[in-house]
Amino acid sequence: MKTALVILAAGKGTRMNSDLPKVLHPLAGAPLLIHAMQSGASLGPSRTVIVAGHGAELVQKAALSHDASAIIVQQTEQLGTGHAAKQAQDALKGFDGTVVVLFGDTPFVSPDTLSAICDAQRSADVVVLGFEAADPARYGRLVMDGAQLDRIVEYKDATEAERAITLCNSGVVACNGTRLFELLEAVDNDNAAGEFYLPDIVGVARARGLTAAVVTCDESETLGINSRTELSAAEAAFQERARTNAFENGVTLPAPGTVHFAFDTVVGRDTLIEPNVVFGPGVTIESGATIRAFSHLEGCHVARGSVVGPYARLRPGAELSENVRVGNFVEVKNARIGTGTKINHLSYIGDATLGEYTNVGAGTITCNYDGVLKHHTEIGNHVFIGSNTMLVAPVQIGDHAMTGSGSVITSDVEPEALALSRAPQIEKPGMATKIINLLRAKKAKQQRGS
């Protein structure tokens, strides 16, 4: 059966106390909205509709950058979740499959749970996602009639018996596309807030003799984020889950609580990740690599057997082939490093291609920016770059070439050539002692004057 997603992302997020729309606050390196979109994408939806409101332009930009086919609609007035869902009606015109309504601030609903919701919708007119709450607090309660969902009761309206129910409402629903909007049309705003609530479609459906079912999930999947405190708790939950997954996939983390993963980090088995490593978005680490302490990686690929760090930074576009070494205080950006090449200390390699088994000495800098444009540096195979070499791009260093320490290389270097570019050394006997004596005399004179 075909599915469509409606993701509600119109809320202001007042408790965030931020100019940024709530659904765009980052969790593990990606906006909350993107987490919801990724989870929903597991269903292979034929249409994805994002209901934007507060900060609609920013929400639209983020959504379309992740999925260019997403349909963006606006809720110009925030009149409740039912009213928000109704804004998707035109975008889903003629769609008769299952519509799943998610929330942009609820990032952890799993693909397995979404699949179960869609399966349940084949035999029920309305499906609600519920959870057994450890502390039901003020959640809405799901009142069952045997296997059927009879009604949803908000905490403030519940009797003592209903408040004792621990099966709670997550807010996520699924319904046939045509029927969803028929039910929403009948929902009223006769409540204290004067809003139209999405869960009220259950009462409308039951009054019409339709069926309603509940699919349950772990409470952790339903975590909604409305404040910085809840965002922090969600980050902690994500990181704990990511570390557990890493262990299960054969990754060694001697100090797991100090390693920070992004939402899309991929790490191969038999990789060692030392303490205080941070992964930004877009990192792939192959099997058998080592990421040493205090390194920061984003938008990069590290192949099998490579060693990164300690205190290294790999920026977007860094591509390390097998058995590469990138050592302490080395930064690599938009550069491909060939097999067996070593950049062991205190260097910047940007906008460059390095061949195989090349050695880059300490203090080497690719001078890639002229103040307006970036330029490329090409270094061949089996090259030796002497310490403190400045490579002024655009420049090419041929295979088996060498550069002398302290050189400023501004022109291409032929294969097997030695390139030197520095002033000749001048030695003046006894001059060091004379200079020291002059300086000491000057210092003594200054002290007498004070």
Swiss-Prot record:
Annotated segments matching region Linker: 229-249
Entry's family note: In the N-terminal section; belongs to the N-acetylglucosamine-1-phosphate uridyltransferase family.
Cofactor note (record): Binds 1 Mg(2+) ion per subunit.
UniProt entry keywords in alphabetical sequence: Acyltransferase, Cell shape, Cell wall biogenesis/degradation, Cytoplasm, Magnesium, Metal-binding, Multifunctional enzyme, Nucleotidyltransferase, Peptidoglycan synthesis, Repeat, Transferase
Ranges in a coiled coil: none
Name the record gives this protein: Bifunctional protein GlmU
Organism name: Roseobacter denitrificans (strain ATCC 33942 / OCh 114)
Claim: Acyltransferase is one of the keywords in the record: yes
Residues that, per the record, bind Mg(2+): 105, 226
Source species taxonomy: Bacteria, Pseudomonadati, Pseudomonadota, Alphaproteobacteria, Rhodobacterales
Catalytic residue list: 345
Region (N-acetyltransferase): 250-450
Substrates-to-products reaction catalysed: alpha-D-glucosamine 1-phosphate + acetyl-CoA = N-acetyl-alpha-D-glucosamine 1-phosphate + CoA + H(+); N-acetyl-alpha-D-glucosamine 1-phosphate + UTP + H(+) = UDP-N-acetyl-alpha-D-glucosamine + diphosphate
Pathway assigned in UniProt: Nucleotide-sugar biosynthesis; UDP-N-acetyl-alpha-D-glucosamine biosynthesis; N-acetyl-alpha-D-glucosamine 1-phosphate from alpha-D-glucosamine 6-phosphate (route II): step 2/2; Nucleotide-sugar biosynthesis; UDP-N-acetyl-alpha-D-glucosamine biosynthesis; UDP-N-acetyl-alpha-D-glucosamine from N-acetyl-alpha-D-glucosamine 1-phosphate: step 1/1; Bacterial outer membrane biogenesis; LPS lipid A biosynthesis
EC number(s) given by UniProt: 2.7.7.23, 2.3.1.157
Positions with a binding annotation for UDP-N-acetyl-alpha-D-glucosamine: 8-11, 22, 75, 80-81, 140, 154, 169, 226, 315, 333, 348, 359
Superkingdom of origin: Bacteria
